[in-house]
Design a protein with these regions (language model features):
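Segments surrounding the PLD/"HKD" phosphodiesterase catalytic module and close analogs
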Residues: 101-129
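A short, charged
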Residues: 128-139
Length: 139
């Protein structure tokens, strides 16, 4: 995994002072099962993010999570379904919901912002950049 993402997550963990949600972090087997269930192959950086940062409690961003019981209010499966109803492109995967808008990872690993008004111009080259410029900066 790229050092940039590892570094961004370490910074996020330090800033959160160890605060995490009660949602357990997924392992590789569960992520693979979840991918099959939702019909979407996750980008490798997103898998790493899920396993190491999806339960961090910091600032105002609330990343989407994958859970065994599928009932969390920030459940990825639900966001995929809702996002598709609102017009998110089918090859974009929501990673964070923000007041009805979504940050999504595209097939090339770029993060794009999608609002209820449609595709926005805001984008970040990868998850690490999004963590630093959005989650941490707006925290």
């Amino acid at each position: 995994m790229g050092g940039k993402l590892i570094e961004a997550i370490q910074e996020l963990k330090a800033l959160s002072r160890g605060r995490v949600t009660s949602t357990p972090l997924p392992d590789d087997d569960f992520i693979s099962e979840y991918e099959s269930e939702v019909g979407f192959l996750f980008h490798e950086e997103y898998k790493y993010f899920l396993k190491h940062a999806s339960n961090i409690f910091f600032g105002t961003k609330d990343p989407l999570v994958v859970t065994r019981d599928r009932t969390d209010r920030s459940e990825l499966r639900n966001a995929i379904h809702e996002g598709r109803e609102f017009g998110i492109p089918h090859d974009w995967l929501p990673i964070c919901e923000d007041n009805g808008d979504y940050y999504c990872i595209t097939p090339n690993g770029q993060i794009r912002f999608w609002s209820g008004n449609g595709v926005e111009k805001e984008s970040w080259k990868d998850i690490a950049t999004w963590v630093k410029e959005v989650w941490i900066a707006e925290g």
